[in-house]
Structures are given as structure tokens and as C-alpha cells.
Amino acid sequence: MAIPFVPRIDDAPYAEITQVSPLIQRVIAKNPSKFSYHGTGTYILGTNDVVVIDPGPKLDSHRDALHAALDGRNVVGIVVTHCHSDHSPLTEWLYGETGATRYAIGPHRVYEGFVEEDDHDASEDDPADAVESDEEKETTDLAFSPDAAVIDGERFLSTKEFA
């Protein structure tokens, strides 16, 4: 059974603000893939004072939609759930616009033997796992570093009521 107030994401429009519930809005980036399904969802929690979760990939249309969605609002925090190329790259732009604290697990360290580019022979891979030629490749955003590092399972609350 579907939650009655949550609209399905299958046919959600790209780069448009969708009201998911009274205090949550969503903007979907136009980056459909096997990793992001219909596209990466950026969530805005609150009404005037807001927290942005997963600013998203570096797509002009997504950045412009976020800019419009946040116009006249006070961004009090930016939360990055994980540092993949479809979730964190617009964080720097949003931080530059708002100065809001960036919360995330990170920064990612590069360990000896870490392979940034995949150079293995893909001829033996399962064809179902293949990335379409126009599909964005999933990578780790090694440049991202939060202001406040959180650990797995940690919870945090605003001392302010979202208004």
C-alpha cells in the first residue's frame, strides 16, 4: 500500500518542485540511470528555514530549479547522504550561495590501491550491468569535504522549529 501523501517518482517531472508532504519538497535531477532510477532526488525540509538533503549532480537545469525552490528561504543546513557524483557535487554551489553548514560522512580518503578510474576488461561482465553510452558513470566525489562530519547512525536535530 502506498503512503497517500507521497507522489510516485516514476513520472515525476525533472527540474520542478514537487510537494511531497506539508514540510517536504523534492526536485528530481535529469540523470536517470541504473544507480539513480528516474533521477537523483534533492529534498528540501521546512518552509522558511530549510535543510537541503543531497543537492545533486552538476546539471544546470537542476541547479536552476534548486535556486528557484530556495528563493526567499533561509538554508540552515546542507546534508549529504553519501558522496557519489549524483548526490554531492552541487553542495559547493549551494554552500557558496548560502554559507549553510555542510553535514556528511567524509571526507573520503584515498587509500593505497584505490582505483579512481575503472580500467578492467568489461568483456566478461554481465550485460545487464552495462552502463548505457549516454548514462552518467557513478563515481565518488573525492573533492567533497563537510564542515561537520557525522558517523553512521548519528542523529541531529535543529534547535529551531522549521517554520
Q: In which residue ranges do the predicted regions lie?
A:
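Conserved beta-strand hairpin/beta-sheet module of binuclear metal-dependent hydrolase folds
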Residues: 10-11, 15-72
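Accessory terminal helices/loops
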Residues: 1-16, 118-122
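Short gly/ser/thr-rich secondary-structure transition/capping motifs
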Residues: 7-10, 26-29, 34-35, 144-152, ...
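Intrinsic structural disorder
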Residues: 3, 11-13, 19-21, 81, ...
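Active-site HxH/HxHxD metal-binding segment of metal-dependent hydrolases
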Residues: 57-162
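Short beta-strand segments
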Residues: 51, 162-163
